[in-house]
């Protein structure tokens, strides 16, 4: 049965819009609230723990418009996508179209995890990437962009590399075709990382459509200026833009042209290494204890994001690396300047994201004032840096730029404010505009103006009891006693009462109109001036973007200097050799916990593979990880925790450390181990750095030993990578007898009065002692279990029957 006749016009409008956005929660604007109805209301009230009510048989709930961002934040973090429906006109404007006309409403934007622009919904030091994966003619490509900063990258990839790509990029949302999701390998990756996934049919990723989208968005007639793009690269970039257009309803921020992520320019760190080395979080998912938590001394939001990007993709070009190292050295050598620069950076706003909000019309007066304060700080930075005749600071000075005219305009126009909504007014300097000054004067002194006019009329009429009063019917009016009659033609009779006569004048009506409309007029004028300011800023947007990038780099590199100063890091020698020579190296995270034993390593060509034997708890895994981390730190342009470091450029870092089941993929610990090891021997080159811990331990002794042996041979003879291999298989130490570039080391252990002391020191040689029972004792095993283990071990060594 058709119930449309029983549904109110507002609900008809809602249901029409909801039918177009079935997969989204529809935030429907009604006055000062966003309302949700039916299943949306039931779901949202449950998630947000807000009151669910009913109007008739319609479930409903709502959130206040002015505090909606906090609710959006909670929903988006849980992976929900929200369609924002706004009122496109006022009720007064609707009435002009007809007495019963419904206020026009429409969805103006779709909020998804990867398309957030609101500052309150974004993590300051994290990029909020939206990513896309396509397959065109069996060729894969991946692209990722950030709406809030305009960053846009792409590159071709392979199916087996998608895990590493997605771990490195860490997008908040992934756009993908439904057919690709059906592939077990891709489904398991998406499930493992729990990205928000948006699926479309294959036609959405059409190459021709994507080509046209790219041309339309960037206002170009051909893509030749972007380079020789492959079909899969066109599809992945164009599809990403098409999705952004859909979510932003055509109101696109100014995105950078998509840049090819050149794999040769950056170190490749596979997904296993990213996890095992705990670059961004520990194995348990905590930030505390990760590498970035130990080295992040950045002050600004853009500096923090740059550090994270650099750590996920370290440089692989010695010239670029040494440029950064030279800048860090410059600031280390001038600590006064370093401190001055870092102090100036405090309070600098996130102008990358502010600029994007300005471009899409979502900025606030608070944003503009923050931009003004930041541009003021640029002058201070320039004053500090101009004192030094150095090519290092000269480059920064030119990139920071000067904003004399813009700063003067912002100074003249804005007053200090914390206004989040432009329609609240009160942020434009009244002295900037004579008309605005008049409106504000009228608002502030309306009573005084009425009294001034009253006194004027008393003098004109010579009636000292004359009053100017107000009511909702007449508005402002002049009232005199009925014993007086005003003959002045300027006074127009309005009303005669028993004891009084009421008049008005054109002057009084004009003042009334000014008083009543002054606030609205002032706000409208402030909005207009605000728009003009935004236009001025957009005209120099590219320059401000360059400034933001310079601030981010200055912040990151001075933070490296601060790190080096505080923890006695040294400048590494980075060149195109095959060296990896570290003196007194330390683990950048573990050393913070207290006393740390520094160790040397020399993986030069003649001993490029090191085999480490020794018991658990002796420090093998820490030693492996610390050297990989030292290599990565050097490649992001940081000084390193060592007394000396000489490192030839590393193209790839691989790690097989730790044991874990991948239950989601149905893989056992041993299968995970073998898969990760296979990735290493299939991809590592002579410029790669490999750490392997206990290969083969997840299977039988003979199987495990055989696999470990053959893997070492492969890495030594074929891959020829710099590698550190830790093992319990002491038999492997025989390899140095016939593999010329392998060298054996062990963890130094001292035994004294029946006790074992792990010295955490690397020494030449090998050992066949595992001290497993001692470790069990440290773990808290009961003495009876330890005694029984000692007895059984004695029998095993004597080849005795364990059952006797």
UniProtKB/Swiss-Prot annotation:
ATP binds at residues 614-621. Gene3D superfamilies: 1.10.1420.10, DNA repair protein MutS, domain I, MutS, connector domain, P-loop containing nucleotide triphosphate hydrolases. It comes from the Bacteria. The keyword Zinc does not apply. Keywords: ATP-binding, DNA damage, DNA repair, DNA-binding, Nucleotide-binding. PROSITE patterns: DNA_MISMATCH_REPAIR_2. One of its GO terms (molecular function) is damaged DNA binding. SUPFAM superfamilies: DNA repair protein MutS, domain I, DNA repair protein MutS, domain II, DNA repair protein MutS, domain III, P-loop containing nucleoside triphosphate hydrolases. Belongs to the DNA mismatch repair MutS family. This is DNA mismatch repair protein MutS.
